[in-house]
């Protein structure tokens, strides 16, 4: 057992973080629990997540208006099986969702009152439930739902340049659900509208269609109407202008329509009509100040519509590609597209983004319309009309936020476009994190429920429409499979539901904190350009600039930074300290990218005096993407920690500040691939993040409060916690063991990547513990710190060319002492199905198999635990029926004599695959059939008796604590929820009264809101105790029902499987040539040679080094951090301490030198080494020290294989490739050249014929080998026949002349 006393640690950090980093799994856990709100009482549930989805899906009515199905509330049952049971049986860890619905009906649609209502709890399916580790178990596999970074709903302004050099601007309104609408300027100075990227039409037609029917109204919206007096002096001013409104001669009835250019003749007509003034369109020329709004006038002048009807027809025709049947149809089509909340939804985020972006336009418009009485009235009328439209489509009253598009949004967008044309506004940056938001697991699940409930709603309506009888209940209408099938397919097939990377705790945690731009509704690898992949200045403190994959997904998959959190709108926030006039306050605020825009922030490293004032007059700050020098008084915010910028994996790299970004990226990624070793060892040079990652990944077991260790073994730890009746938070008062909690160790559990997860206690009997004390280590931790590799003595020097090109030379000591030995656990599964020909069977009685092969099988045909198995050994004996033909008379006679035993069965046993050997560490057998042995009735009676005893103990414990709390107290008010007095005020809590409390009816009837004793503290403790008692009673009942269910039905298995056998084989893999190793700085390599200890270079005192790295791997890679680590690691080993050097806040060059000097080592970190082979001293001094090396999960055992014969491709008839297909090694064009160069004609012919695609030749060769004959002449390869056919296809007649000359 590990010693609890850990190595002393020295921290080099100069700056302390102001706040503690949040729980690294908070992103997953909070998102899911906010979605289901399982711990929130029904009355306090907020309208979010599942509650919001269910409310939006109901009520459902039929077309006749006779039925109304309403939603009331939902609830969950507890999971039927534990997480471990689900993994073993291949089941899904889920809970059943039950929804309380109310169905009302009446005889006639025009009746006001409903005749009758039926309220019922309906089963709506099972949904996967998140484990404490932030994962889901789906069909026995642990999966993670990755958060998606996608374009935020709202409005986005962009620009493009036409080939003629003119800038064109566009505004795109992106809803959460519904049609996209885009406003675009063109080279002719007009504004067009595109809906769903279909045909375009002028924006004035859209404004006219929604209610601004006259030109004058549209022009008035943009202050483009000018009223000019009709005086002779104004003739020159008016001629050449355009009319803004119609001019009607009352006497003649003649009309001069709006948009008419005023000529001398028109001017005379207007004068003759007796008009004192005329409304014209404002003109713009270069000398005018302010905005040039001529784009609106141009658009109106080119608009072919003049009335609302014409505009509606244009909109309908362009979008539907046919004529509208009538105006009402066209109008309802437009209303459906943008003003129906069921069809079009901006979402809260979309409305928030539009409000933020166009706030100035909205306020300017409001101010402007306020002074225009008639126009204001028209605008209000249209607004009311839109609200009525929403209300008519949704059966609920309008909320505070209008989540559909309104005419005000369209006008504000046009105004912003006008500002863009005039150069008075800026376009948006689509890669800015204000325009991108995160869809976490909760939101993704909500989207699936919306789809499922929409389908269910359609089915319910169909059923209601076809029902004439009033005898119908909600349960008759709901089909649970409709919803659960959508959710199940999401978890099983979605690109964002991933098989969890479980190589080590860091890999597991990084997978949960990953943010992907891919997936449904996101980007694709092919479409994503350089800009979207690049690091953006808004990523600071939000997304890690280092950790991202190296392949085609680079920049599309990122990791959240250590302090980053996601707000309720899905935007990533990071914490900052508020700075006021140069004074750094202790106030910490969370800012999104939008909140931070235009603010001035400074790093945490700037000098601060004792009074928390910035100690210098000017500082280099950050604002937008620039780094200007600003006065201290202008600073708004300051970082909270130097680690804030990077993710957890990057924060684990010591001296990160000395590494090139590309190599740091590799270092962060390769730590995730480190295989847990036989004996874990924490780094002697760390960053201080190791403990945080180990704890938050949930791989270690932590204490839950003050107490002491009562018993500890390798299998479990028992801790007795102190019980505080008044401030009890961490421990149950009603625990029958009175504060004793047992923690079971995970032993040799297989991870998703076949690595081994195993826990071991690090506390001793009688040891005091507190909240957060590490009780047990995992296979990748030491003393509660992440331990992925080993501290080994390294020398940077070439050694006889064996470490050429990043190859690594190891000492044999690392093999003998199992320094880099790892355990890998492989799972093998066999199942029994009921086939058409009969049932399969697990058995050790297999025909034609030797006793030697069956020696390790038990009576069920399962291999015994502890057996050492190798390739082709039987793991599970299984027979399956053959397809039977009509039996012969002899067979009939045999069957009559011996029964059915002699019927044909074939051996379908499961064998150890090629290249595998190990020891069987665990076997499991599950059967759908009820367990034989003890009678089912007897088992059920035993369960009842056991749970009855537990209930009696629970009641005794409850009475004991209640007596302790209330003994000697007086009754203040003990009344029932119906107002009945249960005990007189002032009466003492005697034994008789206390005994009543444990009876269920009495307890349920008490109204605790009125108090019990009148003492607040006592009353709160009593209420907490009563709540816990009720909860535990229900828990007991559920647990009893669950156990009875399991006895009645046997083991639950996936559909179609009658029996399931699992065998786990453990392999011990030592480090060997071909294994990949790496440090934490991107310094990776493959083991090239393992030398005897005596051949390794050694120091003056005779100490041989463990590992030799090539010094040429350092300068060009620019990861100098490894040299700092090497020297400081040597000092740490000599001094017997551990160093913590946090990134951007760690040990300096001088401090490293000082520690080397303190350890009595050379300050430059170099010493003379001696050649192990000759004993001679090397010419130059060599950099020596301790570096933390990892063994990566790219092991040569998993990659190398050899093929004798095997499968061939059906198309080319050439051998397949790859280990999984038992394929061959590719012999390509350049390899052919190599053989040609050596003149190896026979080998070359063999390679290109019988070993490749000479089908006839290889069969003859096989036959010759079997018979021991000489090899025949090879035939014609299939690829030559393909060539002939291709040439024939080109019209060249080619025949093979196989006559021997």
From Swiss-Prot:
Database matches in Gene3D superfamilies: 2.40.50.100, 2.40.50.150, 3.90.1100.10, DNA-directed RNA polymerase, beta subunit, external 1 domain, DNA-directed RNA polymerase, subunit 2, domain 6, RNA polymerase alpha subunit dimerisation domain, RNA polymerase Rpb2, domain 2
Gene Ontology cellular component terms for the protein in this record: DNA-directed RNA polymerase complex
Alphabetical list of InterPro entries matching this protein: DNA-dir_RNA_pol_bsu_ext_1_sf, DNA-dir_RNA_pol_bsu_external_1, DNA-dir_RNA_pol_su2, DNA-dir_RNAP_su2_dom, DNA-dir_RNAP_su2_hyb_sf, RNA_pol_bsu_bac, RNA_pol_bsu_CS, RNA_pol_bsu_protrusion
GO term, biological process aspect, one: DNA-templated transcription
EC number(s) from the headed UniProt entry: 2.7.7.6
Catalytic reaction equation(s): RNA(n) + a ribonucleoside 5'-triphosphate = RNA(n+1) + diphosphate
Enzyme class (EC, first level): transferase
GO MF assignments: DNA binding; DNA-directed RNA polymerase activity; ribonucleoside binding
Organism superkingdom: Bacteria
CDD domains assigned: RNA_pol_B_RPB2
PANTHER family: DNA-DIRECTED RNA POLYMERASE I SUBUNIT 2
Quaternary organization: The RNAP catalytic core consists of 2 alpha, 1 beta, 1 beta' and 1 omega subunit. When a sigma factor is associated with the core the holoenzyme is formed, which can initiate transcription.
Similarity comment: Belongs to the RNA polymerase beta chain family.
HAMAP family membership: RNApol_bact_RpoB
Protein name: DNA-directed RNA polymerase subunit beta
Gene name for this UniProt entry: rpoB
């Amino acid at each position: 057992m590990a010693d609890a006393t850990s190595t002393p640690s020295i921290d080099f950090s100069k700056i302390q973080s102001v706040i503690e980093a949040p729980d690294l799994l908070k992103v997953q856990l909070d998102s899911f629990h906010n979605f289901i709100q399982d711990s929130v009482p029904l009355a306090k549930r907020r309208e979010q997540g599942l509650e919001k989805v269910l409310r939006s899906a109901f009520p459902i009515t039929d077309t006749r208006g006779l039925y109304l199905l309403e939603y009331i509330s939902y609830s969950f049952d507890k999971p039927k099986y534990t997480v471990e049971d689900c993994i073993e049986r291949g089941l899904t860890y889920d809970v059943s969702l039950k929804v309380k619905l109310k169905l009302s009906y009446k005889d006639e649609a025009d009746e006001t009152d409903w005749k009758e209502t039926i309220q019922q709890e309906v089963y709506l399916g099972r949904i996967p439930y998140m484990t404490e580790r932030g994962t889901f178990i789906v069909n026995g596999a642990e999966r993670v739902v990755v958060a998606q970074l996608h374009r935020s709903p709202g409005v986005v302004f962009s620009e493009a340049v036409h080939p003629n050099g003119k800038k064109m601007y566009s505004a795109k309104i992106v809803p959460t659900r519904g049609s996209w609408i885009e406003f675009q300027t063109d080279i002719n100075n007009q504004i067009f509208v595109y809906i769903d990227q279909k045909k375009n039409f002028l924006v004035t037609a859209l404004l006219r269609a929604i209610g601004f029917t006259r030109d004058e109204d549209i022009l008035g919206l943009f202050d483009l109407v000018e009223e000019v007096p009709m005086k002779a002096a104004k003739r020159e001013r008016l001629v050449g202008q355009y009319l803004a409104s119609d001019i009607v001669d009352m006497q003649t009835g003649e009309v001069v329509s709006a948009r008419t250019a005023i000529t001398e003749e028109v001017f005379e007509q207007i004068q003759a009509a007796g008009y004192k003034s005329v409304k014209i369109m404002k003109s713009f020329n270069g000398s005018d100040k302010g905005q040039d709004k001529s784009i609106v006038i141009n658009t109106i002048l080119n608009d072919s519509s003049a009335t609302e009807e014409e505009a509606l027809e244009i909109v309908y025709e362009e979008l539907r590609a046919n004529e509208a049947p009538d105006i009402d149809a066209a109008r309802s089509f437009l209303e459906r597209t943008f003003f129906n909340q069921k069809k079009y939804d901006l979402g809260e985020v979309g409305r928030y983004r539009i409000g933020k972006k166009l706030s100035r336009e909205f306020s300017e418009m409001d101010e402007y319309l306020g002074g225009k009485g008639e126009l204001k009235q028209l605008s209000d009328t249209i607004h009311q009309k839109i609200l009525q439209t929403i209300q008519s489509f949704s059966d609920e009253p309008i909320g505070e936020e209008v989540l559909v598009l309104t005419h005000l949004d369209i006008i504000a967008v046009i105004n912003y476009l006008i500002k863009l044309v005039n150069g008075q506004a800026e376009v948006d940056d689509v890669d800015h994190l204000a325009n991108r938001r995160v869809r976490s697991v909760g939101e993704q699940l909500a989207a699936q429920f919306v789809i499922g409930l929409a389908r269910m709603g359609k089915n319910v309506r169909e059923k209601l429409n076809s029902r004439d009888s009033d005898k119908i209940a909600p349960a008759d209408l709901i089909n649970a499979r409709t919803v659960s099938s959508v959710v199940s397919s999401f978890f099983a097939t979605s690109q964002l539901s991933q098989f969890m990377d479980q190589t080590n705790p860091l890999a597991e945690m990084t997978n949960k904190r990953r943010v992907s731009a891919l997936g449904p509704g996101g980007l694709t690898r092919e479409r994503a350009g350089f800009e979207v992949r690049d690091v953006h200045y808004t990523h600071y403190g939000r997304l890690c600039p280092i950790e991202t994959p190296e392949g085609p997904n680079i920049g599309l998959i990122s990791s959240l930074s250590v302090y980053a959190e996601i707000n309720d709108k899905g935007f990533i926030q990071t914490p900052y300290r508020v700075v006021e006039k140069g004074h750094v306050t202790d106030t910490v605020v969370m800012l999104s990218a939008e909140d931070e825009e235009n603010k001035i922030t400074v790093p945490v490293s700037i000098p601060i005096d004792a009074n928390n004032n910035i100690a210098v007059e000017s500082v280099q700050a950050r604002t937008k993407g620039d780094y200007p020098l600003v006065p201290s008084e202008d600073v708004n915010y300051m970082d909270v920690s130097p680690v804030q910028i990077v993710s957890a994996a990057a924060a684990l790299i010591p001296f990160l500040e000395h590494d090139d970004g590309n190599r740091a990226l590799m270092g962060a990624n390769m730590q995730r691939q480190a295989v847990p070793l036989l004996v874990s060892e924490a780094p002697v040079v760390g960053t201080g993040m190791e403990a945080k990652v180990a704890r938050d990944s949930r791989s270690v077991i932590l204490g839950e409060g003050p107490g002491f260790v009562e018993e500890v073994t390798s299998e479990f730890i028992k801790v007795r916690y102190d019980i505080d009746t008044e401030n009890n938070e961490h421990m149950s008062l009603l625990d029958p063991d009175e504060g004793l909690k047992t923690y079971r160790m995970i032993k040799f559990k297989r991870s998703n990547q076949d690595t081994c997860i195993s826990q071991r206690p690090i506390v001793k009997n009688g040891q005091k513990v507190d909240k957060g004390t590490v009780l047990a280590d995992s296979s990748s931790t030491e003393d509660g710190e992440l331990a992925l590799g080993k501290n080994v003595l390294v020398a940077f020097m070439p050694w006889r060319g064996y470490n050429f090109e990043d190859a690594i030379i190891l000492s044999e000591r690392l093999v003998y002492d199992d320094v880099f030995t790892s355990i890998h656990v492989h799972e093998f599964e066999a199942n029994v199905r009921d086939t058409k020909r009969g049932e399969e069977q697990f058995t050790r009685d297999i025909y034609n198999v030797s006793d030697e092969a069956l020696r390790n099988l038990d009576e069920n045909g399962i291999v015994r635990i502890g057996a050492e198995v190798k390739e082709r050994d039987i793991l599970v004996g299984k027979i399956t029926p053959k397809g039977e033909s009509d039996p012969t008379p002899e067979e009939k006679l045999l069957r009559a004599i011996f029964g059915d035993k002699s019927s044909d069965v074939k051996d379908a046993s499961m064998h150890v695959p090629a290249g595998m050997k190990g020891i069987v560490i665990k076997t499991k057998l599950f059967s759908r059939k009820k367990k034989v042995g003890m009678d089912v009735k007897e088992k059920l009676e035993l369960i009842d008796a056991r749970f009855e005893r537990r209930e009696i103990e629970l009641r005794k414990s409850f009475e004991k604590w209640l007596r302790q709390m209330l003994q000697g107290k007086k009754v203040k008010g003990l009344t029932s929820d119906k107002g009945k007095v249960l005990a007189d005020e002032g009466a003492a809590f005697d034994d008789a009264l206390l005994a009543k409390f444990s009876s269920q009816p009495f307890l349920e009837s008490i109204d605790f809101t009125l108090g019990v004793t009148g003492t607040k503290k006592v009353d709160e403790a009593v209420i907490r105790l009563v709540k816990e008692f009720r909860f535990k009673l229900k828990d007991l009942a559920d647990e009893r029902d669950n156990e009875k269910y399991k006895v009645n039905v046997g083991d639950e298995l996936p559909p179609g499987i009658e029996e399931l056998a699992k065998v786990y084989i453990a392999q011990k893999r030592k480090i060997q040539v071909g294994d990949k190793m790496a440090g934490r700085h991107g310094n990776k390599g493959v083991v090239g040679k393992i030398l005897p200890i005596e051949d390794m270079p050694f120091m003056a005192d005779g100490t041989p080094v463990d590992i030799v790295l090539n010094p040429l791997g350092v300068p060009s890679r620019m990861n100098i951090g490894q040299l700092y680590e090497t020297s400081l690691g040597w000092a740490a080993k000599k001094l017997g301490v551990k160093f913590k050097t946090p990134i951007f806040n760690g040990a300096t060059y001088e401090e490293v030198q000082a520690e080397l000097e303190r350890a009595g080592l050379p300050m430059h970190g170099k010493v003379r080494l001696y050649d192990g082979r000759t004993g001679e001293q090397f010419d130059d001094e060599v950099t020596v020290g301790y570096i933390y090396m990892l063994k990566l999960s790219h092991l040569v055992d998993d990659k190398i294989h050899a093929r004798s014969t095997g499968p061939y491709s059906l198309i080319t008839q050439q051998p397949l490739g790859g280990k999984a297909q038992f394929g061959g090694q590719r012999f390509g064009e350049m390899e052919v050249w190599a053989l040609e160069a050596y003149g190896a004609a026979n080998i070359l012919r063999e390679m290109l014929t019988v070993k490749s695609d000479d089908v006839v030749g290889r069969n003859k060769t096989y036959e010759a080998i079997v018979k021991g004959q000489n090899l025949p002449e090879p035939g014609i390869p299939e690829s030559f026949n393909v060539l002939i056919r291709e040439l024939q296809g080109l019209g060249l007649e080619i025949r093979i002349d196989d006559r021997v000359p």
